[in-house]
């Protein structure tokens, strides 16, 4: 069950058709109603991801975050490029200027201003909480039960066509012309902003029961076609034996 995984739908289209008989008229001038064509199979035309919200499951980690909505986290890849993900399995690592929020692979997570999210050395990462808007909160010395915002916010980004994002592996996605440019929820105008849930992770949106039924259906269809070919071969063999 890959965190933040989105199910994929495969689309097919037909290949060339063999024309056995074109639409024409018979000897007495009557129009024949249909053509006679034989299909030569099909091939994959596209594979699209279904960006439907997955279930949100509680974890025991305060650095796990689930997005409720259409947003994506932004991270900096090893090549310096910006990637996007729905996998909020994060943690704080020691940085030169304090503590950096990063993915489980050590990739820096972007803040709402587009920079790497780094806590100053004066903060204790274990005391950080995050509200639904992504603001990082820290308890004051006077009142530990009333944490206040420290001016840092986890960045959330949206796309006009998320199905156009390019999958690069490790749950990372890259912006393409088909997806459109990334829209920063904190700056750009979006239809509806996302919310964050601290201590939760988004599960895969694949319905196991449905996919198992589809798998069994496909298997039975394959067996049916295989038996039809076997039966046809047997009939042709018997027809050939009639001449002997």
Language-model features: where?
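Amphipathic alpha-helical polymerization modules
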Residues: 1-244
């Amino acid at each position: 069950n890959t965190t933040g995984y989105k199910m994929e739908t495969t689309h097919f289209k037909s290949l060339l058709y063999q024309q056995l008989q074109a639409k024409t008229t018979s000897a007495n001038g009557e129009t024949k109603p249909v053509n006679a064509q034989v299909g030569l199979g099909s091939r994959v035309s596209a594979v699209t991801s279904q960006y439907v919200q997955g279930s949100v499951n509680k974890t025991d980690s305060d650095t796990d975050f689930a997005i409720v909505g259409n947003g994506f986290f932004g991270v900096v890849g090893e090549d310096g490029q910006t990637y996007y993900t729905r996998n909020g399995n994060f943690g704080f690592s020691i940085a030169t200027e304090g503590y950096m929020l990063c993915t489980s692979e050590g990739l820096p997570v972007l803040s709402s201003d587009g920079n790497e999210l780094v806590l100053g050395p004066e903060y204790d990462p274990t005391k950080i909480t995050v509200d639904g808007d992504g603001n990082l909160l820290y308890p004051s010395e006077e009142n530990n039960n009333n944490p206040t915002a420290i001016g840092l916010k986890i960045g959330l980004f949206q796309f006009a066509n998320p199905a156009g994002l390019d999958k690069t592996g490790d749950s990372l996605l890259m912006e393409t012309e088909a997806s459109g440019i990334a829209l920063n929820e904190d700056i750009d105008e979006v239809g509806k902003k996302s919310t964050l849930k601290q201590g939760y992770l988004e599960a895969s949106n694949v319905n196991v029961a449905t996919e198992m039924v589809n798998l069994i259906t496909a298997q039975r269809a394959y067996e049916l076609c295989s038996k039809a070919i076997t039966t046809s071969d047997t009939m042709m063999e018997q027809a050939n034996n009639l001449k002997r």
